[in-house]
Amino acid sequence: MHWLLSLVAKLPLGFLQGFGACIGELVFWLSPGYRRRTRDNLRHAGYNEAKFFTKVGRNAGRQSMESIWVWYRPTKAVLSRVKISPQAEHIIGSAMTSGRPIVFLTPHVGCFEILPVWLAGTHYEKTGRRITILYRPPRKEILRAVV
């Protein structure tokens, strides 16, 4: 599995995002349970418009392919794609050098896997701060070996 994912990660990020969107939409429309849960969750959150519903599958697929790209690419390649405002850089840099504990809450929007790579690549050398990440292991055994 690792060899296949590392091969996939060699493809350009833009291609993977487009491919992920296609696969995500296909899975979305072929899985009635996934569509039902998505519709229910969106309604519970107050999003009743169809435009939100139709984007979920595409964006889930994009996120999956982006994650593979982040996990299997060299740190330098990943960091070259990060765009951060000077204000955010200052706030995070000050927090990292303060010595106080920091909690980063990363919603599952976009490629949330990139934050730990960015922190390690930009601030770890300067501060020596450790990073602890809380997550729920994947339910599927094949994915547990990857994550």
PLM regions with names:
Residues 100-147:
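Catalytic core of membrane glycerolipid acyltransferases/transacylases, capturing the structured
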Residues 1-111:
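Membrane-anchoring hydrophobic helices of lipid-metabolizing enzymes
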